[in-house]
């Protein structure tokens, strides 16, 4: 009974909305600006059916044509946020929320079950990807303005003591056309994924009774992009400024040791403390132990335990000295140099005992969790293969949702482009 009443109320509401919109068909006189500085002339009234949260609604709008541009437009469409769209802003918002959360077909099913609106999975996905890309364009434009210093974000209210930016990357499965000609890690040497770079910014104001840092609840914000490192750096810098970098007492960059991460950190936040994720460093140490296992024999575990203690203390010179006591030749010698180079290069970022004494995080678990929760749970499901634009759109939606900024997407001014 209640669902039947809901259906009836939706139908009734759709009729009311249709009548309300009919009161202003958007006639703006015999001529109106086409958006490119020309005069578009009134032609006639034309009907357009748009999907809304109250079902399909048909509106008769004044239609103008610009002879110089060669295209038509309905001013009323731009005012309603439906220019070039087949869905209302309200329905697009609903569709995008479903599409960022679950696969498109399931999302369409959720919209049908929860709102009584019928959409195909393809239509839902197409609109969600487009709205995500539009949101990404706004974010990128804002980041460029911050980089150019034409926009200066105000520091957040209640400035935290410590701000962290943790950085990582993960592969997203792609359609063959998106990876053609790219080298990969598979046996055939072909790429099947494209790397998406992810940054997670979060704050900290206290430590627990044992002195371990505690992330402030609900303080994480995310950004993700397929752009090269330079583009990612611009976005990361803007997010850092928005979160208070330059005003907080302590800014820390966390990463896995990749050179591009530290290059960006030094470029955009030279004042920041740089820390290599301790757990990545431990993985490298275990790889070093495997490399030397044939020489260590039954002393392997004892030797590795000693080096682990040195790593946890940040005593990288002692670790390097212990490893260099072994004389290797040929390929093994080169592998040892590479393994030790990781610790040599990152030694200033591995002062873990000192960092912990300062109450700082030494692990990048937040961004690794983000790679799984924000990216993997939606874009890396079985059988999925994305286009870069499609994946980028959904990623933007997911980052905004995970960052608590969902409403910001829908606060942008409506498009002024010609109507479809």
Please report, for each region that a protein language model flagged, where it lies by residue.
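A short, compositionally biased
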Residues: 28, 42-45, 59-60
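The −1 position to Zn-ligating cysteines in a subset of zinc-ribbon hairpins
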Residues: 30-33, 49, 65
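A broadly conserved sequence feature marking short terminus-proximal activation segments
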Residues: 1-41
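Short, non-ligating residues that shape and space the ligands of small metal-coordination modules
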Residues: 40-42, 75-76
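Short Cys/His-rich metal-coordination motifs, predominantly Zn2+-binding knuckles/fingers
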Residues: 34-38, 53-55, 67-71
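Short linker/helix segments within small regulatory modules
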Residues: 50-61
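Catalytic center-proximal scaffold of phosphoryl-transfer enzymes
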Residues: 1-17, 61-420
